[in-house]
Each structure stands twice: as C-alpha cells, then as structure tokens.
Amino acid sequence: MQELSIAFGGREAVRNVSFEIAPGQSLGLVGESGSGKSATSLAVLRLLPAEASVSGRIRFTAPGATPVDLLALPERDMRRRRGSDMAMIFQEPMTALNPVMRVGSQIAEAVRAHQPGLDRKSVELLVLDAMHEVALPEPERRMRDYPHQFSGGQRQRILIAMAIVNRPRLLIADEPTTALDVTVQAQILALLKTLRQAHGLSMLFISHDLAVVAQACDQPGDQIAVMQQGHVVEQAATLDLFHTPKHPYTKKLLASAPTMATDRAQRLASV
C-alpha cells in the first residue's frame, strides 16, 4: 500500500497510509475507534461506499503473477479476486451471517462464486473440508443448521471457513474477536495462527486492543502499525513496538492498559 488516502464528502478519513505485508506475514493495524483502520481495510477490497474518494496505490502480487494495482482494476476483475485471492472476516459474528440460510449453503455460495465449474458433490466436499479445518464439530450434520443454532464462537468459525474456503493469499480480519469472551477469543486467535502456518497466509489484523494484536502478530517478521486520526504514526516489529515505542501516542496506548504489576492506587494514562 502506497500513500493511501480516503475522504468522505471532502473530509479526509485516511491520509497517506503506506505499509507492506510479505507472504506469510501478519500486520496488525491498531488504533482507537474512528482512526481509519476499517476504512483502510475496506479500501483493499474496494468495498468502500460509492461516495468515498480514494487515492494512492494498493499493489497485490499473486504467486508467479505480475503485481496489479487493485485500485486501478476494472470492477469485473476485482470481483474475481475478492473472495479468492483475498478475503475478509467481518466484525460481529452474531449478525454477519444470513439468518434464513443454512450455514453450509452460505459457505457453498462463496465456492460457487469463484469456482462455478464444480459439481454439487465437489462443492459440498470443499465446504466440509473448510468446516473441519476451523474445528466445527460434526460438520456433516451441522452444515444443514441455521446460524441461530450456533454459539458466537462457532459463528465466527463459520465466517472464517467462508473466508478460507477458496484458499486466499491475503486474509483481512477486522476486529474478529470483539464480540467474544476471552476464552473463545483465545481459541479464535489460535485458529488463525494455525491457518496462517498451514497455508502461508498473509494477514491484515485490525483491532483497537493492543494485547489481542500482540497475540495475532507474534511470529518472526510480523509487525504492528499504530493509527491515529487517519495517519500511521508508528510501525515496528511487534516486540520492538512493545519494548521500545517511539511515538507519544503509542506510549500512551501502552500505558493506558493495566498489567498484573499495576498498583491499584495508580491512575492509568489517558489517551
């Protein structure tokens, strides 16, 4: 991504954001609500509202292919890449699924959109493989269930299955653990790590929670970028950012989170 800027109605929401995600690498994008994190991720998939004004370059390179600027692609080509070369796990697993469609049909819909030549049996096998891979119990039976019959953590696994079923190279996870309790949150983060390692996925992980981002971006080469008011104010390797933060905003973010060693009488830093 090179100097991405996004404006809505003449008001700039993202300004000159640049970063790179290498194959197999995870980049955490962290910042407070309204800092431009989600707008940046939606720009990658070109899912911003029609009134958004977008400039800059977003170069994507598939294995063995020539780099392409996603912002310059015709919409037809972008539709082909969206969901196959790159996919997104959206926020709010409790509401992101269609409540009147069986979950297996929703995953199958993603397969048919990008592999239209497959017969019904082949599609079903891919759906079952994806459900197995995200550790959903009894997928042969549960693929015929509706979203309301699953817990919040299981619904998040279904959304992840929909995202990975076509084997994308880039996975965008936008606050994938926000609505989950800490135990299920840890399970989802462990699952994402397993999928990264199994498929060599690159990942853009978005959160307002530095602790969650630290868990999602804990492999060698992983980095964290801190956003404030539409700018990336600091980007560094995960350990470097936590041990030696450079920007005042990053320091305040870290200081605002309590630790086991924090004195109960000590006031936390405000951001």
Predicted regions and their residues:
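Short catalytic/signature loops enriched in Gly
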Residues: 67, 137-143, 235-271
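ABC ATPase NBD coupling module
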Residues: 65-87, 105, 113, 240-245
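Helical segment within the ABC ATPase nucleotide-binding domain
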Residues: 186-199, 211-214, 218
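A short, proline-enriched helix->beta-strand linker immediately N-terminal to the Walker B motif
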Residues: 165-169
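Conserved ABC ATPase "signature" region
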Residues: 121-141, 254-255
